[in-house]
Amino acid sequence: MKKLVTCKEMKDLDSTTIREIGVPSEVLMERAALKVVEETEKYLQKDERILVVCGSGNNGGDGIAVARLFHLKGIRVEFYMVGNKDKMTRETALQYKIASGYRVPEVNNPQWSEYTTIVDAVFGVGLTRPIEGHYADIIHEMNSARAKKIAVDIPSGVNGDTGLEMGIAFSADLTVTFAYRKRGLCFYPGRLYAGRIVTADIGIYEQEAVTASAACLENKDLQLFPERDPDGNKGTFGKVLFVTGSEGMCGAAYLSASAALRAGAGMVKIQTVEANRIPLQILLPEAMVCSRFDQESNEQLLSWCDVIVIGPGLGTSVASREREQWFLTAAAREKKPLILDADGLNLLAAHPQWYQYLGEHVVLTPHIGEMSRLSGRTIQEIQHEIADTALKCAAETGSVCVLKDACTVIADEKGQMYLNLSGNSGMATAGSGDVLSGILAAVLCMYLKTEEQPPMVLKAALGVYLHGLCGDLAAAEKGMRSMLAGDIIEYLPKALAIGEEESGL
């Protein structure tokens, strides 16, 4: 698990290292430059000619130091000061003086076509306004050059918190970011502008008490999944109830239930309309199918299950509305874990009085369109503030919010947040969300290997990460263009095996 920081959090960490620990800012700048040179050298070939483009802030100071280090290695390098020299920070002015002493070549009118590598050190995480005018022209020239492109800490023009483009942004092949990955390097388009991202240790003081605004999971976090109990039975590995599948929509029920079983749930029951019974029993004989919706049957299903999933293929008819309301109310009464997805969310948006049944036992899994219906905000507003939207939804409902997008945000009412970096565009296909709801249900049934009972938000984040990992494995063999939702399920065994390898099993 890796911490992800906002611009303010990174500034505070810098300040703590410099003022409280006593590490001079010049030392941090030198270490940053060394890391950029170290990573850039991996891409260099013979007869390289490097241009480092520098602003007047500390990002520019990093860049001048990079130019000096390349110069001392005998590599052809020049630096170009696009920032106002009269407004250089103290550290950058010192780097400029040192570079002058070492006679590092400086250019005032670079011929962009002559360079094989361009290093962007114009703006860092401190950028607060759109880039325009002279600076925009320079970044346009940098992007147009046929050269390898390296960004120092963050591509100029990328918002360090949201990943949004601030007027124009540098398009890098490699970004060497310092100490922690910035949140803006997780969200698109910032993640796209960054290219390959390397997080470099430059000596920023790290203490356990440092609270970051978000975190992201890695393959090694799958070791939190428990070993399969050798004397367990199908009942002890989790029982999931799916309230789903209107007529003609048994595919959603099948995908969701199948994913739950493949992800490790011991038993599955699907409550659906009678017309779906035979198709489901043929497609998934391991599942039990119930087509009764009366009080007695509902009570039996509620008593039987450990987790409820409402929504995939449910429809929005009067009968579907009544089924959802019954199970929402009952789950709230018994605090039974419940996942609300697809039409379950659409019905919730149409009946805001049901919000009273939500709480910490609920996981909401909206995509951007469903969140727009739930929140009343436009899709563009949500895309521009996706993290804040997820946090607000979680706070207002008391539930875990899994806001699905290219970078899915998982948040709870306490402000704990995960950004998911697994997955790919091949997963943007019909049924992928149904598969996710099934995987989440299976994970909610598990007792993770943690010292304390883990919060629901961590289980949800693990489920989302596992879903994305399956998609990455599928894309590697099938290609993103050809992927189907069922391919994600197909690769669950391989993805779970990676978790077992991380656990040393």
Question: What are the roles of these predicted feature ranges?
Answer:
Residues 1-79, 89, 174, 185-339, ...:
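Small-residue (G/A/S/T)-rich helix-start motifs and N-terminal tracts that mark the onset
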Residues 83-86, 154-156, 343-344:
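Short beta-alpha junction loops
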Residues 65-143, 278-290, 299-300, 304:
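N-terminal small/polar loop signature for handling phosphorylated ligands or for N-terminal nucleophile
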Residues 100-106, 132, 156-160, 221-226, ...:
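Short gly/ser/thr-rich secondary-structure transition/capping motifs
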Residues 116-117, 122-213:
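Internal gly/pro-rich beta-alpha loop/helix module
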